Amino acid sequence: MAAKDVKFGNDARIKMLRGVNILADAVKVTLGPKGRNVVLDKSFGSPTITKDGVSVAREIELEDKFENMGAQMVKEVASKANDAAGDGTTTATVLAQSIITEGLKAVAAGMNPMDLKRGIDKAVIAAVEELKKLSVPCSDSKAIAQVGTISANSDSTVGELIAQAMEKVGKEGVITVEEGSGLQDELDVVEGMQFDRGYLSPYFINKPETGSIELESPFILLADKKISNIREMLPVLEAVAKAGKPLLIIAEDVEGEALATLVVNTMRGIVKVAAVKAPGFGDRRKAMLQDIATLTAGTVISEEIGLELEKTTLEDLGQAKRVVINKDTTIIIDGVGDEAAIQGRVAQIRQQIEDATSDYDKEKLQERVAKLAGGVAVIKVGAATEVEMKEKKARVEDALHATRAAVEEGVVAGGGVALIRAAHAIAGLKGDNEDQNVGIKVALRAMESPLRQIVVNAGEEASVIANKVKAGEGSFGYNAYTEEYGDMIAMGILDPTKVTRSALQYAASIAGLMITTECMVTDLPRDDKGADMGAGGMGGMGGMGGMM
């Protein structure tokens, strides 16, 4: 086991604070509408230019191991805020730096670290309650666009795109961000249920100009089995032919004689059929077939529950207004499923999302909710160069997370104003003893730091503006972009409540741990020079290298 380097008390805290400051100073230059860029060197390819706090934090690794521990703990603040709300990483870092700096000063002055931490925690709990009171719902497109714009560093086109996407696919819909091929940002919306399975035979194509199959008001047969024997299918095919409607078959697979017969029937015009494989694999396929059944008011024909293909009637088939199939995807538009049944299914999947442990499962379940609830929107980001593309894509993703958070918990006045109002509302809070009171003051002072940093980055005098904002009330604040005072909500400067709340909670959590640190342990750097020159197996002669 390697020898350890151990530092105690003030020595440890000074080193840790130095690491905190290096990381926080690098991150906080990006805060606000006039925040600066940070250039990150990459071991291959061109450097990355970013204004995203968490991207900067992730790149920082310090040589001094004690300093690095401080930096890594603050990096954790940014990561946690990012995971919880997808934004607010820079705000969280600025808050953490302020609480740690002020807290360690108090520890150096002889305060009890545990009481300081209790005071900080008390203040944060009270401030979070105040933020909830200040929060207003974010329901209309205008507010959503404003939140997106602020999070994308005042890029209004991004805010508008996100608002349009949310309008099209609903608040629950899946919105993905991809790299586009042109200079302009684009929005593609896929309405209805789409899954990644195309036609099983090109002979089903009835729209040769687009290479796709379009079925109007089709019946939909859902089978959780391979279909290879056409005899099983005959009763259904005859019933569908009599009804004079097309048929879409979604099954584990359709092969051999069954597929050949379906193709021949389609080409002769006896019955219009298309067949696709069911989406997903294993249990996920069963669940997705059930989703489609709910959406189209059909029944999944599965031998597990005693249903056989030969006995299938038109009542067992689902229906939709339209189905479009190409070689890779199938889209079911306007299924006739009962709205209450669809909502019930969505609620059931939501419960599974809460119980899911892996991110992959959560993502897949979220996709299923979106497909049932509305549709999928794809924002294609346009840019002139690859470097700009990466930077912009990261900003759009941030903005998307922020708007989701805003829809979830509402919005508060942006520009650091909400924290100042929350701090003012709890200014009379008292702890159990004097040290806790100091902890409360540390937290209250830290809540001013985001506003101060936004102002500093805009090249203005922080104290003057902070005092003027503190003297105001409600959503009165300072717009660093236009350099004027006014009602932040009216000016469209909004922050999602969830983002502000998460930033404060995670910053206080990690800062509290760091203030109460008394000892730090790390590996001593290994000095291999002397050992290498020693005589291998001769126990006490390891130092012979020095005699040369």
Swiss-Prot record:
InterPro entries, alphabetized: Chaperonin_Cpn60_CS, Cpn60/GroEL, Cpn60/GroEL/TCP-1, GroEL-like_apical_dom_sf, GROEL-like_equatorial_sf, TCP-1-like_intermed_sf
Catalytic activity: ATP + H2O + a folded polypeptide = ADP + phosphate + an unfolded polypeptide
Highest taxon of source: Bacteria
Enzyme class: isomerase
Listed Pfam families: Cpn60_TCP1
Subcellular location: Cytoplasm
SUPFAM superfamilies the record matches: GroEL apical domain-like, GroEL equatorial domain-like, GroEL-intermediate domain like
Record-level GO BP terms: chaperone cofactor-dependent protein refolding; protein refolding; response to heat
Keywords: ATP-binding, Chaperone, Cytoplasm, Isomerase, Nucleotide-binding
GO molecular function (one): ATP-dependent protein folding chaperone
List of residues binding ATP: T30, L31, G32, P33, K51, D87, G88, T89, T90, T91, G415, D495
Matching CDD domains: GroEL
EC number: 5.6.1.7
GO cellular component, one term: GroEL-GroES complex
NCBIfam families, alphabetized: GroEL (TIGR02348), PRK00013.1 (NF000592), PRK12849.1 (NF009487), PRK12850.1 (NF009488), PRK12851.1 (NF009489)
Primary role: Together with its co-chaperonin GroES, plays an essential role in assisting protein folding. The GroEL-GroES system forms a nano-cage that allows encapsulation of the non-native substrate proteins and provides a physical environment optimized to promote and accelerate protein folding.
Family: Belongs to the chaperonin (HSP60) family.
This protein's name: Chaperonin GroEL
Species annotation: Yersinia pestis
